[in-house]
Structures are given as structure tokens and as C-alpha cells.
């Protein structure tokens, strides 16, 4: 996974006394030791990753440490969404305790969103808070889950229902890590990139329409631009509403209320990746907005067309979901955004004009989810 080292772009996350920065650049893995050492008081590194990343990327990562004379310890977990569980959380905490982890050691989450969420939550609760570093290796993690401090595991009732806000001390993003990703994982990550255009940036969505296919196919310039743009967009929102108090950060949940219900129906498994669920969920959010005479027919047609062109699901059928509207709404009842018995939804008045609606009728949602538009993307 070697490459020439490119110019490093730094994006600050301004959160007062727990602010941090994100470094983005091709070839940064080659400089990992020198970049990370300032964040570790006693120069002890513990890398936590999954079986897939361990096979493809861990050897080179460890090599850079060994060549610098720095010891690095590794913990390898199973790959897949099922790893975000009580069982694996307890097992990871036990392993870290047995290895004598200290609060100021560098616990490194090297992997995709699953590893980042699990390791971040373990760091949040272990010894009442250990520092950790995010090194995301999937496109989804690089543009979304590694930024903002949300950490969590899943449970039987739903996705990410058990967790904490716990910010990393640093995030290192090397786009070259994406070279070993399967095409489906890249498409899933792209599902989160599109979201930023749909929320409040119609020009960026237009850019996605023009460059999305090239990004997925491996165009380095497009990837670097999309990663930086997405991170800057999220950084502004997180700095303004870190813990979803004012409601602004809730905008980042576009597609997620529908999407999490789809993931629940497919058992939080690799049958439907998170980014795929968000893509389908975004189409559903705009579809419902169209039904409510908020968004135009042209907008929903553009979204469905682009999702299909980039290999992402734009309907329940394409996502492999057969549950009825009522069954999907039942999954939504455990949503974290539930407030006073009502579930807010991210809807839109057009591309780039998303808003939070706290007065949505769930019976109307259920009926919409049984419609041809939701089922087949037919409009």
C-alpha cells in the first residue's frame, strides 16, 4: 500500500478543551510513528483492528513502528457489524485490562466504522475514559464515523443504542488505505458522501453526480476532494452542536431513521451495509417529502437516478427489505431521537434543503413505506 507522500490537509475540530485535528493525505501511513508519537506520553501503542484489515494493512502499519524502534501491540477482532456487541465490547475491555492499558496510552482504532465505534466506546468506559486515536480504513469511516466522537454498540432493540460521546485525540486519514477495499464497501461509503450534498449543499450533490462514479472506480483526486469536503462539512456541524442539543447535528442523520430500520430488518448484518442503508434511507426521506408536497418530482428522480448509477439501493426492494411499513415503523420506535413519544424525521424541501420535522405521523410513514415509490422507487 505504498505511495508517494502527498501534501497533508489539516481540518480542526473546534470543541473547546477537547478539540483535536484531522490530518488527511496520501502516504501518511509511512509517517505514522512521527505523526502519532506526540499524542502518547509513554510511547505505548495498542492497535485494535479486524481480521480483514489485519490481513491487508496491519503488517505495513506495524513495520513502520518497528523500523522506528517503537513497540506496538495488536488486538485483532472479527470483521463485520456483529462485532459491535456486548460480547465483543466486554472481551475487548478484558484484553486491554490484562495488557495493563493506562489512560494515556495510545489506543488506536485501525479499521472501518465498526472498529471505530467499538474501540471508541471501550475507550470511553475503560478506567472512566482513555484516550484513543482514529485511523479509519474504509471510505465510510473516513468521511463520517471517525469524525465527531459518537461511539456505540448495537443491541437486539436497535443500532447504536448503547454508547457515549467520546472524542478521539487525533484522526489520521490516508486515502491510500482505500486501495484494498472491495467495490461494495466503497459504494457504501459513498452513500454517506452523497448525504452532505442532500443536507445543505446542492452544489456538492451536483459535483457528486459528475464525479461519483470516478471516485468509486479509484480516481484519487476525486476521493481526496470528497473526503476533505465531507469532513469539513461535518466538522462545522459538530463544533456547533457536539452532543445534539440544539438540533443542528441531527441534520447529519438524514437517511438514518429509515436506514436504521432497514438495518434492523436485515439483522444488522452484511446483507445490508450501513452506507447502503443510508443511501436507501435518503431516497425514502426525499420520497416521503415528495409525497408531502415538500420536495419536487425532479429532486427525487435525480436522487434515485444517481444512486442507481453508482450501484446503491434507491428503494426497499433494491435494499433487500421485504418487511411491511408497520414492521419497519416498529423498528423505528427505539430510535435515539425519540422525544416525548414522538419521532422527528429529517425531511427536505429540495436537494440541499433538509430540515427536522417533529410532527410526522407514523401511520403516514407506514403507508408510504408500502407504496410503489418506497418499494420499487417507481414515481
UniProtKB/Swiss-Prot annotation:
Which keywords has UniProt assigned to this entry? Amino-acid biosynthesis, Aromatic amino acid biosynthesis, Cobalt, Cytoplasm, Lyase, Metal-binding, NAD, Nucleotide-binding, Zinc
Q: In which pathway does it act?
A: Metabolic intermediate biosynthesis; chorismate biosynthesis; chorismate from D-erythrose 4-phosphate and phosphoenolpyruvate: step 2/7
Mind listing the GO biological process terms from this record? amino acid biosynthetic process; aromatic amino acid family biosynthetic process; chorismate biosynthetic process
Q: Does the keyword Cytoplasm apply?
A: yes
The reactions it catalyses are:
7-phospho-2-dehydro-3-deoxy-D-arabino-heptonate = 3-dehydroquinate + phosphate
Q: Name one GO cellular component term.
A: cytoplasm
Q: Which Pfam families match?
A: DHQ_synthase (PF01761), DHQS_C (PF24621)
Q: Name one GO molecular function term.
A: nucleotide binding
Going by the entry's taxonomy, the superkingdom of the source organism is recorded as: Bacteria
Write down the EC number: 4.2.3.4
State how the cofactor is bound: Binds 1 divalent metal cation per subunit. Can use either Co(2+) or Zn(2+).
Q: Which residues take part in binding NAD(+)?
A: 113-117, 137-138, 150, 159
- Cofactors, names only: Co(2+); Zn(2+); NAD(+)
Q: Does the keyword Metal-binding apply?
A: yes
Q: What's this protein's family per the entry? A: Belongs to the sugar phosphate cyclases superfamily. Dehydroquinate synthase family.
Describe the function of this protein: Catalyzes the conversion of 3-deoxy-D-arabino-heptulosonate 7-phosphate (DAHP) to dehydroquinate (DHQ).
Question: How is this protein named in the record?
Answer: 3-dehydroquinate synthase
Which organism encodes this protein? Answer: Zymomonas mobilis subsp. mobilis (strain ATCC 31821 / ZM4 / CP4)
